[in-house]
């Protein structure tokens, strides 16, 4: 069976799964700028660049789009706040498409304590982390198209609502 869950419930299912030892299949959009070939998947808040002043602002405004993208994914940065409406709009206008399936199997934290899902990619031992990607919760919330998870990995309250 398949279900269309609101974003908060979808995230709760994924969190609950990995925190209880379950892996799950994850269909996502890897053509997004925030999905790097270096093993990071993030939704950086590019508008934060506009908050810079002085020489930092001059450096930012002089950067090419490619350099800005590299800068925004090179270290932990503030990310956009993903809403149900943003997610739906990206789906409806084909900005978000299902172009790759992977496995999510754990949670890691960066040096600031921010959580990332640990993703096993099928591209072999490529990238900085040898085939492992670290996908921020914002990226996963925004760009998940589908998941396949064992029904016992679903939180009890959500399972009850689904009649499982």
Predicted regions and their residues:
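Active-site signature of cysteine proteases
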Residues: 1-164
């Amino acid at each position: 069976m398949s279900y269309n869950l609101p974003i908060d419930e979808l995230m709760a299912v994924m969190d609950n799964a990995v925190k209880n030892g379950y892996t799950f299949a994850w269909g996502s959009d890897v053509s997004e700028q925030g999905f790097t070939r270096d093993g990071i998947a993030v939704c950086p808040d590019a508008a934060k660049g506009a908050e810079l002043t002085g020489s930092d602002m001059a450096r930012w405004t002089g950067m090419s789009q490619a350099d800005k993208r590299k800068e925004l994914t090179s270290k932990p940065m503030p990310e956009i706040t993903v809403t149900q409406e943003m997610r739906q709009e990206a789906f409806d206008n084909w900005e978000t498409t299902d172009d790759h399936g992977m496995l999510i199997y754990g949670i890691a934290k960066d040096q600031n304590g921010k959580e990332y899902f640990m993703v096993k990619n099928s591209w072999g031992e490529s990238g900085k982390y040898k085939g492992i990607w670290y996908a921020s919760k914002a990226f996963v919330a925004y760009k998940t198209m589908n998941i396949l998870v064992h029904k016992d990995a679903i939180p009890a309250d959500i399972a009850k609502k689904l009649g499982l």
